[in-house]
């Protein structure tokens, strides 16, 4: 049996604790009341939230939301909030590639934790639109995984995880401006950073304290969707 390369989360990636705990939001419109789950309501404001470990299910939902918002407007920013310990690298790379592919700029904001693949997605946001809240924690490290079976199968899996490691380091170097050798040295073990240290490292551009929110409107809810809600069918 081979485990997919991933991050620090050691639970079942198929068991998402948020399921069944999604609150509903009720809005008053000229046509009566309308109820949304909270994530659909945030989507109307062009906000996408990754708040769990990243697996195929979460990645597919995130990709679908990004594609939908990009089809609605290729110019208005999308705000991607991240509170994730990471997860399956292949799933995360699907989200990463979508962020780079769509025309709409994607702002990224770390709320709580962006570790492993979560830190890669955080760094992959639009230039000057990547941020952490003050008490966020960010962590980079090399891929984790394991393999069982014949020696040839283990060798194949080892080659694959080495390729993934090199590719992730290239992505981090691209978005942080750090030298690949420096990233490789830092990521050899879990490399934890505060919000300020993540900014200094180049993973984000700002730490969102109350005194520096002015001018960062690209990562603020735009409120336009709320104005349009009464005109919806």
Curated annotation (Swiss-Prot):
Compartments where located: Cytoplasm
Record region (Disordered): 214-233
GO molecular function: ATP-dependent peptidase activity; ATPase binding; serine-type endopeptidase activity
Active-site residues from the entry: 116, 141
InterPro entries named among the record's database cross-references: ClpP, ClpP/crotonase-like_dom_sf, ClpP/TepA, ClpP_His_AS, ClpP_Ser_AS
EC number: 3.4.21.92
First-listed, main subcellular location of the protein, grouped into a coarse class: cytoplasm
GO biological process: one example: protein quality control for misfolded or incompletely synthesized proteins
Signal sequence range: none
Pfam families linked: CLP_protease
Family the entry assigns: Belongs to the peptidase S14 family.
Subunit relationships: Fourteen ClpP subunits assemble into 2 heptameric rings which stack back to back to give a disk-like structure with a central cavity, resembling the structure of eukaryotic proteasomes.
Known function: Cleaves peptides in various proteins in a process that requires ATP hydrolysis. Has a chymotrypsin-like activity. Plays a major role in the degradation of misfolded proteins.
The protein, known as: ATP-dependent Clp protease proteolytic subunit 2
Native organism: Salinibacter ruber (strain DSM 13855 / M31)
């Amino acid at each position: 049996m081979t485990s997919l390369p991933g991050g620090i989360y050691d639970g079942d990636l198929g068991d998402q604790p948020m399921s069944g705990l999604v609150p509903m939001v009720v809005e008053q419109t000229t046509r009566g009341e309308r109820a949304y789950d909270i994530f659909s309501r945030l989507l109307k404001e062009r906000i996408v939230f990754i708040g769990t470990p990243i697996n195929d299910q979460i990645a597919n939902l995130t990709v679908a939301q990004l594609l939908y918002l990009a089809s609605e407007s290729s110019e208005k920013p999308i705000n991607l909030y991240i509170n994730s310990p990471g997860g399956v690298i292949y799933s995360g790379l699907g989200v990463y590639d979508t962020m780079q592919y769509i025309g709409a700029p994607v702002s990224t904001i770390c709320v709580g934790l962006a570790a492993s693949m979560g830190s890669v997605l955080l760094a992959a946001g639009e230039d000057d639109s990547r941020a952490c809240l003050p008490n966020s924690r960010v962590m980079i490290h090399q891929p984790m995984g394991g393999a069982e079976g014949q020696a040839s199968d283990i060798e194949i899996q080892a080659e694959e995880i080495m390729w993934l490691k090199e590719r992730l380091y290239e992505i981090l170097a691209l978005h942080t401006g750090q030298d690949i050798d420096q990233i490789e040295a830092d990521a050899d073990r879990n490399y934890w950073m505060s919000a300020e240290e993540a900014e200094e490292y180049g993973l984000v551009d700002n730490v969102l304290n109350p005194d520096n929110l002015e001018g960062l409107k690209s990562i603020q809810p735009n409120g336009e969707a709320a104005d349009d809600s009464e005109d919806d069918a």
